[in-house]
């Protein structure tokens, strides 16, 4: 299971319940966002072309459960050394079970729903977030898994090792891309005085800030989870591991809703446990809101997570302009109708899961209708 963990800076603000490494609006220039949308589009197109023939088959339950798993697992924040936290993405296990193209589609759907309905990741940065996590994550996980697993039997321990290493490589590839995207902003996009317009920290700060946690604790956590889930599936449902065998693909022989009941049950348990993710909640590195740049305590946390280099005295102009470009209906997984953060978190997980299922059912209906 590739679980991509992303670093967060912890601060004592209980209202901030965001998943990390989802680049918000205002941190990337419009031209950077446009380039990453353009770079993601061919992969989305190929993914849809490969999957549209199967969306009216039993592939839909598999796509739904692994996209929903990705959504829910990203709500679990884990503490890391140095006052940061990380969380998983689930793109590795999606790749191993679904194959890379179906994984790209599944994880992209989860990320789009997070951005639109929960404000987790910017609308302008959907292309960037999908490119980093869904596209590169899936392709790296697939390449590493296939290279190491080879033609080993489904029940072989070699596949457990392959999954663990695939997760470690994919998490770091995705984190490194995000670090580069953050780090080039002050180099390429600044005003006449040299003041950054978007993400304020250059490469020599952004890369270590993003990578140290991924190369150590988060990467090791991904190895354990990835290998553990594959080991479980080898015993409980080995058929789910056949998609990434040579020549295999997700198709009409995929398991249906009833056959996937154990996975949905496990997902329900995770959903109920999501409030545990609040315990380590905080603002991710590179996800500070404009007000943080003027708040002494927040500025201290930003500097501590950024090589002890103080942030600008005020939020970059581009960030101030774009940060409020979109207001999500359930921002930060905190529905306005609920005062309880715990219940709000659970409700958000339920709503997100439901929206993912509806998205795939709607896609199946649309593509099926086009064939009649």
Predicted regions, residues:
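Aromatic-rich transmembrane-lumenal/periplasmic boundary elements in polytopic membrane proteins
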Residues: 269-325
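Membrane-water interface at loop-to-transmembrane-helix junctions
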Residues: 161, 165, 209-213, 247-268
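Membrane-interface capping segments at transmembrane-helix boundaries
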Residues: 48-52, 235-240, 362-372
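Short helix-perturbing small/polar motifs within transmembrane alpha-helices
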Residues: 133-178
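Individual transmembrane alpha-helix segments
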Residues: 212, 315-363
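Hydrophobic transmembrane alpha-helices
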Residues: 19-35, 39-94
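Alpha-helical membrane segments and adjacent membrane-interface helices in multi-pass membrane proteins
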Residues: 74-141
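Hydrophobic core segments of alpha-helical transmembrane domains in multi-pass membrane transport
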Residues: 36-49, 69-74, 142, 167-182, ...
């Amino acid at each position: 299971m590739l679980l991509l963990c992303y670093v967060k800076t912890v601060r004592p603000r209980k209202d901030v319940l965001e998943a990390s490494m989802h680049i918000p609006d205002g941190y990337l220039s419009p031209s950077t966002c446009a380039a990453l949308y353009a770079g993601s589009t061919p992969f989305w197109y190929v993914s849809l072309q490969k999957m549209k023939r199967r969306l009216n088959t039993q592939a839909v339950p598999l796509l739904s459960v692994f996209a929903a798993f990705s959504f829910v697992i990203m709500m679990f924040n884990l503490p890391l050394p140095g006052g940061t936290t990380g969380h998983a993405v689930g793109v590795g296990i999606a790749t191993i079970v679904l194959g890379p193209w179906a994984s790209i589609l599944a994880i992209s759907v989860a990320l789009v729903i997070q951005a639109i309905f929960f404000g987790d990741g910017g609308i302008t940065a959907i292309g960037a977030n999908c490119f980093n996590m869904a596209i590169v994550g899936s392709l790296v996980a697939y390449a590493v898994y296939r290279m190491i697993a080879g033609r080993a039997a489904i029940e072989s321990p070699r596949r457990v090792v392959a999954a663990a290493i695939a997760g470690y490589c994919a998490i770091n590839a995705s984190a490194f891309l995000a670090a580069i995207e953050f780090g080039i902003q002050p180099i390429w996009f600044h005003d006449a005085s040299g003041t950054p317009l978007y993400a304020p920290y250059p490469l020599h700060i952004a890369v270590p800030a993003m990578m140290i946690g991924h190369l150590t604790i988060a990467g090791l956590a991904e190895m354990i989870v990835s290998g553990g889930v594959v080991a479980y599936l080898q015993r409980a449902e080995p058929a789910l591991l056949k998609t990434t065998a040579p020549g295999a693909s997700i198709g009409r022989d995929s398991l249906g809703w009833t056959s996937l009941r154990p996975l949905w049950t496990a997902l329900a348990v995770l959903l109920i446990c999501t409030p545990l993710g609040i315990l380590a909640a905080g603002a991710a590195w590179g996800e500070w809101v404009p007000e943080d740049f003027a708040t002494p305590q927040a500025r201290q946390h930003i500097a501590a997570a950024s090589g002890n280099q103080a942030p600008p005295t005020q939020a970059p102009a581009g960030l101030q302009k774009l940060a409020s470009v979109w207001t999500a209906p359930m921002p930060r997984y905190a529905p306005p109708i609920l005062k309880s953060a715990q219940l709000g978190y659970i409700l958000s997980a339920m709503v997100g899961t439901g929206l993912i299922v509806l998205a795939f059912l709607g896609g199946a209906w649309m593509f099926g209708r086009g064939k009649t």
